[in-house]
UniProtKB/Swiss-Prot annotation:
Gene expressing this chain: SCPL2
Its job: Probable carboxypeptidase.
Pfam family for this entry, one: Peptidase_S10
Tissue spec: Expressed in seedlings and roots.
Protein name: Serine carboxypeptidase-like 2
BP term (GO), one: proteolysis
Active site residues of this protein: S184, D366, H419
Species this chain originates from: Arabidopsis thaliana
A GO CC annotation given for this chain: extracellular region
Cited InterPro entries: AB_hydrolase_fold, Peptidase_S10
Molecular functions (GO terms): serine-type carboxypeptidase activity
Signal peptide, first to last residue: 1-29
Length: 441
């Protein structure tokens, strides 16, 4: 009887140890993915997916997609891509903006949506990490309920920790030139992350990261400057009349966001402005505002991606932990989060003093974060201009306009572009390749 009891206890202990081992094995796990459901044949590039544990107990598990450069991964730059939101999966970058795959826009018929290769991937000349952050975004999750609520400044620290651990497990990339990139809301997080990495390079006891600079597209940078640029932008794009614009300027005096409740005249004209623009697609004012998700609407790809990412065979191929999350959503709009950085301009200044390169680009038909606001905050930094406003060309056609500053900052517009580069991926790719290779746009 005693032997039976001892045997039972021993089996239970062994099972417990096995489960603990599996749990520890999953932390910082990584898998090479050679085939993806929906894509015909083997992948024509090297894809790795995995989790990196963050925090003292590694309670936060951040999921990433890593794609090696198709040119020379031993020497090419390493780019960390952060999608905006906060709470939007980095799959938005991978499948819609600058990755080697995208969704095939077929009408959904109940079967798994298809993936096809792109011609504009940034991985042609750079290795890229697409990171799902903050926790709760994409396939990233927490193993417990005990973790600090994500915030802008907190994410800069978590991302830095992620990079230290990731590079510790991928030491062959530790000497590659490293850049942080992102768009939209990442305009607040990326500059803070760059500063955090820079500071960490001078502290004990981790190897320094070969940080060279950062890239930002239509970046939310300063709430006041960016939001107050929408009305001048709308006027310049003929969305509102001269008379309404003059009335807005006169009564609101440049403050269109935090209007005093007693300023009824300003509020009245802002209501008129909203009536003129509420049926405009803010991300790209040239495109129709879709009523339904149909294949001719740009958001249809988001629907297809949701079906794809929630398919069991896809999750198995990506090696997603079954206990991580329930339904995958592209953007977790109600994610618990503290927006504690109201302006990232001080971070830009500090990063500039530290000598880092930066490329700031704007799709010039974005009403959400208009290029006028981006130009305004760059202008307020009072950097000397070394290459003044000029067109940049693709095949003898104007693709946008650019200006270069003495602090290694390059600003560029993408003609006809929107809030993200999914609207002009080919042009954005050429712009990026020139900049990352040290060539003038």
């Amino acid at each position: 009887m005693a032997n039976k009891y001892f045997s039972s206890v021993l089996k239970s202990l062994l099972l417990l140890l096995h489960l603990v081992f599996l749990s520890k094995q999953h932390v910082d796990s990584a898998s090479i993915v050679k085939f993806l459901p929906g894509f015909e044949g083997p992948l024509p590039f090297e894809l790795e997916t995995g989790y990196i544990g963050i925090g003292e107990e590694e309670e936060v598990q951040l999921f990433y997609y890593f794609i090696k450069s198709e040119r020379n991964p031993k020497e090419d730059p390493l780019i960390l891509w952060l999608t905006g939101g906060p709470g939007c999966s980095s799959i938005s970058g991978l499948l819609f903006e600058n990755g080697p795959l995208t969704m095939k826009l077929d009408v959904y018929n109940g079967t798994l949506p298809s993936l096809v290769s792109t011609t504009y991937s940034w991985t042609k000349t750079s290795s890229m990490i697409f990171l799902d952050q903050p926790v709760g975004t994409g396939f990233s999750y927490s193993r417990t309920q005990q973790f600090n609520k994500p915030s802008d400044s907190g994410e800069a620290k978590r991302i830095h920790e992620f990079l230290q651990k990731w590079l510790g497990k991928h030491q062959e990339f530790s000497s590659n030139p490293f850049y942080v990139a992102g768009d939209s809301y990442s305009g607040l997080v990326v500059p803070a992350t760059v500063q955090e990495i820079s500071k960490g390079n001078y502290e004990c006891c981790n190897p320094p990261i070969n940080l060279q600079g950062y890239v930002l597209g239509n970046p939310l940078t300063d709430y006041a400057i960016d939001s107050n640029s929408r009305i001048p932008f709308a006027h310049g794009m003929a969305l509102i009349s001269d008379e309404l614009y003059e009335s807005l300027k006169k009564t609101c005096k440049g403050e269109y966001t935090n209007v005093h409740p007693r300023n009824t005249q300003c509020l009245k004209f802002i209501e008129e402005f909203n009536k003129c623009t509420n049926r405009i697609l803010q991300q790209l004012i040239l495109d129709p505002l879709c009523e339904t998700e149909t294949p001719d609407c740009y958001i249809y790809r988001y629907l297809l991606t949701t079906y794809w990412a929630n398919d069991a065979t896809v999750r198995e191929a990506l090696q997603i932990n079954k206990e991580s999350i329930g339904e995958w959503v592209r953007c977790y709009r109600t994610i618990p989060y503290d927006n504690d950085i109201k302006s990232s301009m001080p971070y830009h200044v500090n990063n500039s003093i530290s000598g880092y390169r930066s490329l700031i680009y704007s799709g010039d038909h974005d009403l959400e974060v208009p290029y006028l606001g981006t130009q305004a905050w760059i202008r307020s930094l009072n950097y000397s201009i070394i290459d003044d406003w000029r067109p940049w060309m693709i095949k003898n056609q104007i693709a946008g306009y650019t200006r270069t500053y003495a602090n290694k900052m390059t600003f560029a517009t993408i003609k006809g572009g929107g809030h993200t580069i999914e609207f002009k991926p080919e042009e954005a790719s050429i712009m990026f390749q020139r900049w990352i290779n040290g060539q003038p746009l």
